[in-house]
Amino acid sequence: MPIWVDADACPKVIKEILYRAADREKVVITFVANQRLSIPASPYLRTLQVSAGFDVADNEIVQRANQDDLVITADIPLAAEVIEKGAIALNPRGERYTESTIRERLNIRDFMDTMRASGIQTGGPASLSQRDRQLFANELDKWLLQQKRKK
C-alpha cells in the first residue's frame, strides 16, 4: 500500500522520517505539492507536482488514495475525505484520525474559522516537538507493520 503526503505543509523533519522509512521498508511514498520538491534519490520516493490553486493537491490525493493507503496530512477536511474512502489519515504530530475523531476535529476547525472571521486572534499551532516526532514515527511504524502482516 502506498503512502501519500500532503507535502506543501509537511514539516521537513517529518519528510526526513518518511525518506528513511521508504528505503528501510521498501514502500512507495508520493509527495504531492503545488511546487517543485527536492527529495533524495530513491526508487521508493516520488513527487507529484500539481497546478497551483486552492485544494488542488488535496483533490489529487483524494482521487488517488485507495482503501488502506496511508495519507500524511495536517489538513482536517482532506483527512475526512480520505477516511471516507477507507484510507488511513495520520497528521505530522502522530495523531491517527478515525471516523469518530475526525468529526470532532472538523467541528473544532469550523469553530476556530468562525472565531477568526469575527476578528478574534486564535494563534497557530505550537512548533513540532521531539515528542510529536516520536509519536509520528511510532504511528508510521505501526501502519508499516500492519501492511507487512497483510502480505
UniProtKB/Swiss-Prot annotation:
Belongs to the UPF0178 family. This is UPF0178 protein PMI1258. InterPro entries: UPF0178. Pfam families: DUF188. CDD domains: PIN_YqxD-like.
